[in-house]
Amino acid sequence: MAQESKPVEVSRRIKAPAAIIFKILANPPRHMDFDGSDMLRGAVLDHPISKVGDTFTMKMHRLGDDYLMLNYVVEFEPDRCIFWEPASGDPSRAEGNDPAKVGIPAGYRWGYILTPEGDDTTVVTEVFDFGRVSEEVHQSLLSGGGTWINGHNSMRESMAASLERLEKISTE
């Protein structure tokens, strides 16, 4: 049964053109530079996202565990929005994974909406939408004491930190 939950959204006005910000967001190797959750450890391949259907894999770390996360790009509008759906399971290891579900989108999305305000300012909204996940995935996201999702407080804080870091690297 899918969860009936509203997306978590955090916005920040950044004094940089949307094109500069989008170029960073569409480049997975740069994601670690602005990650406010401190979960990202780098991208597996060094290539930018260019369209819906692209995939990219990130090296992740959470609660003392290193793993890989395959992501499917599901929305891509240059200088306006980019969203991806992480897949279930770590394709690099068999233990703890249901082989039938590894690599299948888990039903939640991460993304960014860019709203230009003139030529040199952009409102960037980071979005985490877990409204389409199964109860099983929802509980999995809450595992580990809900360190980054339970009640959304720490998630909002890490999203705000991400946008603050994104601002810094967008204006260098």
Regions found by a protein language model. Name each.
Residues 43-103, 161, 168-172:
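Glycine-rich portal/gate segments that line the openings of hydrophobic small-molecule binding cavities
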Residues 10-12, 44, 69-75, 107-116, ...:
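Hydrophobic/aromatic beta-strand elements that line small-molecule binding cavities or substrate pockets
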Residues 92-160:
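Beta-strand/loop substructures that line and gate deep hydrophobic ligand-binding cavities in soluble
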Residues 3-5, 51, 64-66, 103-107, ...:
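Short coil/turn motifs at beta-sheet boundaries
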Residues 5-13, 18, 55, 68, ...:
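Intrinsic-disorder/low-complexity, polar/charged segments enriched in Ser/Thr/Lys/Arg/Asp/Glu/Gln
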Residues 13-17, 59-61, 87, 115-117, ...:
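Solvent-exposed residues in well-ordered beta-strands and their adjoining turns
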Residues 21-25, 31, 56, 73, ...:
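Hydrophobic pocket/interface hotspot
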Residues 1-52:
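Hydrophobic ligand-binding cavity/cleft-lining segments
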